[in-house]
A protein has these predicted regions:
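Amphipathic terminal alpha-helices
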Residues: 139-167
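Generic structural signal for individual residues within well-ordered alpha-helical segments
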Residues: 65, 96, 116, 147, ...
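Short, flexible active-site loop motifs that bind/organize anionic cofactors or intermediates
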Residues: 54, 85, 105, 136, ...
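Terminal hydrophobic/aromatic helix or amphipathic segment near a protein terminus
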Residues: 96-140
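Oxidoreductase cofactor-interface core, primarily capturing Rossmann-like NAD(P)-dependent enzymes
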Residues: 1-103
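Structural motif detector for alpha-helix initiation sites
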Residues: 61, 92, 112, 143, ...
Length: 167
């Protein structure tokens, strides 16, 4: 995150017009998390590393596209740093339950240290090191600045899953 911060500072100090988006999990049919969960579902079991109580705040890729288009066309986004987050915070466990709703897929928790060991040993592990770090980092935001500037009605996870038939 230090390199991202340094890059932001370079942009801010450049004198250029900017809008910096700090993205949460961006979900769509082909994002990493969706693909990882879908792949696990085909095997009949979804693994939750650790307790699953850590939170995420996913945002729909369609909402992201609309917000970026708004930012390009509206000056009110100028010289802003915005947390690009969805409308709801939820635990990873609740996200997985929603994702697997109405299926016969089992949910199984695994020791977090074991998940990290597997990610270090196996480049094809279900969750990579970066994904684990982001997941357990519990990164959320109040999203106030985004709500204040954007006219986009953010899609809830349930709405997104239903409309995309991801679950």
């Amino acid at each position: 995150f230090i390199s991202k911060y340094k890059a932001e500072q370079e942009i801010i100090n450049s004198g250029l017009d900017y809008t910096i988006f700090r993205a949460s999990y961006i979900i769509g049919k082909t994002d990493y998390l969706t693909k990882a969960l879908s792949k696990q579902m085909k095997k009949g079991v979804v693994i939750i590393p650790g307790s699953g109580k850590y939170r995420l705040q996913p945002i729909s890729v369609v909402d992201v596209a609309k917000i970026i288009l708004e930012a390009i066309n509206e000056k009110k986004f100028s010289k802003k740093i915005l947390d690009l987050v969805g409308p709801q915070k939820m635990s990873f466990e609740d996200f997985v339950k929603l994702f697997t709703k109405n299926t016969s897929v089992k949910i199984q928790k695994t020791n977090l240290d074991s998940a990290y060991d597997e990610a270090k040993r196996n480049p094809r592990s279900v969750y990579g090191l970066e994904s684990l770090n982001i997941l357990v980092g519990d990164y959320t935001s109040d999203g106030k600045q985004l709500k204040k500037l954007s006219d986009v009605k953010l899609t809830t996870v349930a709405e997104f899953l239903q409309s995309s038939r991801l679950s």
